[in-house]
Amino acid sequence: RDYGNRVGIWRMMESLDKYGMRSTVCLNGEVCREYPEIIEEGNKRGWEWMGHGHNNSQLLPGLDEDTERSLINDVLAAIEKGTGHRPKGWLGPYVSETYNTPDLLAEAGVEYLCDFCCDDQPFEMNVKSGSLISMPYSVEVNDLPLALYFGAGGQEMGQMIRDQFDVLYAEAAD
């Protein structure tokens, strides 16, 4: 389970560096403690850190409101301690949330949430306090559903990602 943290992230850094690109990283709080070298290198590159739970084993559904509030605040604090920056964004582990998640994130000062796949444009969410923007998430090119649910292989996934990029790039020119 640690391939991404041992090998993949460094290859991605090289590619992003080659093209002078910054990244927004979905960051599990435990990565700050377990892989501080990733955090150090990301900070050198000016990356933005987005909350992504403690790890991908603890999902939000099934948590009562107080437990979820505590988990969100603990994750945000761990990432702030590890990176020096409080996350402005959130993507739930396995893109999971509860009915309370948007309100709890806004309450904690999070500015945007990436859990919803219902639009391809950002939109303001109705929350009890503060504000929260829903940022589009392209589950269509997420490796987990592509591989597990649709049986896509590496070449097919790569082509889907390139196709999506080409469409978005063309739309951006309009």
Per-region residue spans from a language model:
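Extended ligand-binding regions for polar small-molecule ligands
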Residues: 154-155
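Glycine-rich, positively charged active-site loop/lid region within alpha/beta enzyme cores that binds
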Residues: 133-151
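Catalytic alpha-helical scaffold of carbohydrate-active enzymes acting on polysaccharides/glycoconjugates
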Residues: 1-134, 158-174
